[in-house]
């Protein structure tokens, strides 16, 4: 399944997205934040399933998971039954001067990891794994028009596509959302030398999207 997540609005402390499947709207994402804080209330409505996300980092910026691993920027995830889990960023110190960052999501007993690589001419790629098997890829363009962000999800089925919509909302809030700024007429192209981390590069399969049907 292929889903397109297109930002439609960016106000001072809020943002809105449409979720499209075959050019038809199948859901929305709404973000409500506040000045000077990464805390936000997020609602993902996709195929009629409503998932809410709230900042759950508490007073401490980081939490130690195990030796060499720390988690940051934790958000809770809840559905209509108040059942859900958490999503957060993990920093793994492989060596003294090598730290690898990725996203981890626990949802209803399932564990997802999302690994990012930057491609110099194409933008970002998030390779999404569940229990060690790749189930999706999220493409993030290297060009941003009018401060509005777009994401494309390539997933093996609808369930995994819905989970990736949650991951996209999280990526937006921690990487792209800037409270206090409105969308303005602009064009930005990001340039990067590309990812060098061997661990992250191993997770990226450039042929994965060719296996996905719309």
Which functions belong to the PLM regions below?
Residues 1-214:
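Intrinsically disordered, low-complexity proline/glycine-rich segments
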């Amino acid at each position: 399944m292929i889903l397109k997540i297109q930002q439609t609005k960016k106000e001072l402390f809020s943002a809105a997205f449409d979720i499209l499947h075959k050019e038809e709207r199948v859901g929305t994402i709404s973000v409500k934040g506040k000045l000077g804080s990464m805390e936000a209330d997020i609602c993902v409505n996709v195929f009629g399933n409503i998932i809410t996300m709230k900042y759950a980092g508490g007073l401490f910026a980081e939490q130690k998971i195990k030796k060499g691993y720390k988690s940051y920027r934790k958000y809770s995830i809840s559905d209509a039954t108040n059942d859900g889990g958490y999503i957060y960023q993990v920093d793994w110190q492989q060596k003294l001067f090598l730290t690898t960052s990725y996203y981890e999501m626990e949802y209803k007993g399932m564990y997802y990891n999302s690994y990012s690589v930057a491609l110099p001419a194409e933008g970002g790629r998030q390779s999404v794994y569940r229990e060690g098997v790749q189930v999706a890829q999220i493409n993030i363009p290297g060009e941003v028009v009018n401060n509005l962000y777009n994401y494309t999800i390539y997933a093996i089925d609808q369930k995994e596509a819905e989970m990736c919509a949650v991951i996209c909302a999280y990526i937006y809030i921690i990487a792209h959302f800037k409270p206090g700024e409105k969308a303005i007429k602009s064009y930005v192209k990001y340039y990067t030398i590309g990812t060098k981390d061997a661990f992250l590069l191993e997770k990226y399969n450039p042929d994965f999207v060719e296996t996905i049907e719309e």
